[in-house]
Regions:
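Acidic, metal/ion-coordinating pockets
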Residues: 12-273
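Short, low-complexity intrinsically disordered segments enriched in A/P/G/S/L with frequent Arg
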Residues: 3-10
Length: 273
């Protein structure tokens, strides 16, 4: 937490029932997949992580996710994959997500698209599962509307999705552009979910905190990918577009890959962070 940001006092019961969650920020291209492959297992084992959630929407060359890449991330230890505005960039993911029924716990059911997409959109915006320990958990995926493509209201979508979730431990990936919109959702859901973590901007924010109701919040977890880039893309291509105003093809960068992730410790009985 930030210096000066007070920590909540934990009871003995909360410490005994503690659960650690790792959320890995937007995996960008082959460099992002490589750094996750090299470091995720060590991070999980050394920190006694029980639940791993990865945002995979940029994992296929920076644009979307394929079934093969999704399976690879599940093999590396992900329990659930979240996405965002690039979810449909690789069309084959649609059939993958629809290959199992809604009540399945197989891998295709555990990759989410934003839950505030219009009714009838393929896939699902939330998932509820059970860890080997018996601990129930849920993950909700939402997308912002400020400076983003049109979608339904994420606040009301969160209310609707929560009606069907019985787990106490609930993580929300809010894939959004505006800091204000992310903060607003964090406060709106404070005390009702375990964590609201922002994705999409690829820049990790230093505002991680636990809100008064026990909900962990961070504006953006950041990108797991090439830091020698402009948010994952080759620098020269982005600079050309800014300097000339002309269209430019964006290719994934490869240099200096780093993994950005946030760990949350919560009480498994109450869901409070």
């Amino acid at each position: 937490l930030q210096a000066g940001c007070p920590r909540r006092a934990y009871t003995i019961e909360e410490k005994l029932n503690s659960l650690r969650i790792l959320f890995v920020g937007d995996v960008f291209g082959s460099a992002g997949r490589r750094i996750v492959r090299e470091h995720l297992r060590h991070v999980v084992e050394s920190n006694a992580i029980e639940l791993v959630v990865i945002n995979a929407e940029n994992s296929a060359g920076g644009f979307g996710v394929t079934p093969a890449i999704a399976d690879d991330l599940f093999e590396l230890g992900a329990h659930v994959l979240t996405t965002g505005n690039h979810v449909w960039d690789k069309r084959e993911i649609i059939d993958y997500m629809q290959s199992v029924p809604a009540d399945s716990h197989e891998r295709p059911r555990r990759i989410l698209r934003p839950g505030n997409y219009v009714p009838g959109t393929p896939g699902h915006g939330s998932y509820q599962g059970t860890l080997p320990s018996g601990q129930q958990y849920a993950v909700i995926n939402l997308q912002g509307r400020v400076f983003m493509a049109a979608s339904d209201d994420p606040f009301r979508a969160a209310d609707e999705l929560l009606k069907h979730i019985t787990a106490r431990v609930i993580l929300v990936d809010f894939h959004a552009e505006a800091t204000s919109e992310k903060a607003a959702l964090g406060w709106y859901l404070d005390g009702r979910v375990t964590a609201v973590l922002g994705t999409h901007t690829h820049v990790p924010s230093a505002d991680d905190r636990v809100l008064p109701g026990g909900t962990a919040f961070q504006t953006d977890v950041g990108m797991s990918g090439p830091w020698e880039s402009i948010i994952g893309v080759e620098r020269e291509q982005v600079l050309h577009r800014f300097l000339t105003g002309m269209p430019a093809k964006f290719d994934q960068a490869k240099g200096d890959p780093r993994m950005s992730a946030t760990m949350i410790e919560c009480d498994g009985l109450t869901g409070r962070a």
